[in-house]
Amino acid sequence: MKILVINPNTTSSMTDKIAIAARAVARPDTEIVATNSQDGPASIQGFLDVATCIPGLLAEVSRHPDVDAIVIACFDDTGVDAVRTLVSVPVLGIGEAAYHAASMIANKFSVITTLSRSVPGLENNLMRYGLAQKCVRVRATDIPVLKLEEGDPATLFKIKSEIRESIVHDKTEAIVLGCAGMADLMAQLSEEFGLPVIDGVAAGVTFVEALVNNRLSTSKIGAYSRN
């Protein structure tokens, strides 16, 4: 099985981190092809970045026609509908994957994301997926996406602080990491706080493996039809 994991921004260091997270959970016989867009924004933070990254994302998908599934490694689920229309293999965004994983193991969950301007888009997605009632809050750390690549201890401190606030005030039962740039923190944070911490990259790879194993592909009747 070959899974294409696409980072829709152009920051290769984030793609490297995403690749490590994907390969850590993939089956031994699964090949992970990790790549990023060649054109577009360096990070995706809010509605404008979401819109401007889609042409580069679609171009990158077209460069990899021989894959069995696609994971779009942006927590906004950028371009998922467009890519599902373009291809027939299963396509999953890491936001949708993480929300569903959290809903399966906890009665309620919170999302820890980057900038405040990203919050409305994530809340819109939760409503669209029918999971808004299970998410008690989407919390912003006000950390720019690219700051996650610097390894600054202050960045990790802010993420941990929001998790503590969520546990105390939101009474959350699980934490969803709301950015692919946080993928490397899942195990560390889960162990420290003693509750499930979900990374969408890991969840996305695991879910698309299951879809391929069950011989399920994107429906071409209705919304994702090109006819």
Positions of PLM-derived features:
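Glycine/small-residue-rich loop that forms an oxyanion/phosphate-binding "nest" at active or ligand-binding sites
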Residues: 54-107, 111
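Short, well-structured alpha-helical segments in soluble
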Residues: 51-66, 157-171
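Short, flexible loop segments at boundaries between secondary-structure elements
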Residues: 198-217
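N-terminal beta1-alpha1 ligand-phosphate binding loop
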Residues: 3-25
